[in-house]
Regions:
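His/Asp/Glu-enriched, well-ordered alpha-helical/loop segment
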Residues: 1-73, 93
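Extracytoplasmic low-complexity/disordered linkers and repeat tracts associated with LysM-containing
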Residues: 14-15, 85, 113
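Short, solvent-exposed cationic patches
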Residues: 109-120
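C-terminal cap of metal-dependent C-N hydrolases
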Residues: 51, 63-107
Length: 120
């Protein structure tokens, strides 16, 4: 039986899918419990959802001729401690900058007078 992990309501965050899949790998290690292998868990958030909606020939896995958005991780994508290194959408690198990274960069090495009045 194939298992897919996806968004089932608007309040659910898609960024948690790798964590949910990783949890199922951990459950498989509990004696008497069921869970997924690492490969099954990765497929549950990539190729299996594409197959379920009938798009398995176009999306869900990296093969020549298929459309792909790719995320590059600095470790195991199913581990909570792994971080995103790069994102490509339709082959184009995407910026990973966000409000938090811009604030970090702005105040990492503050210069004289660069801090807001409240911080001086």
């Amino acid at each position: 039986m194939k298992v897919a992990i996806g968004n089932f309501y608007d309040g659910e965050q898609p960024r948690y899918a790798p964590q949910y899949a990783g949890n199922l790998v951990g459950v498989a290690r509990v004696p008497g419990a069921t869970g997924l292998t690492w490969g099954e868990a990765l497929a549950a958030i990539t190729s299996v959802p594409a197959e379920i909606i009938g798009e398995g020939d176009h999306f869900g896995s990296l093969k020549p001729g298929r459309a792909a958005d790719v995320v590059v991780w600095d470790g195991d994508p199913l581990e909570v401690t792994s971080g995103v290194v790069a994102v490509y959408v339709d082959g184009v690198a995407q910026s990973l900058a966000n409000h938090q990274t811009r604030l970090r960069d702005r105040y990492r090495h503050p210069q004289e007078g660069s801090l807001p009045k409240a911080y001086q």
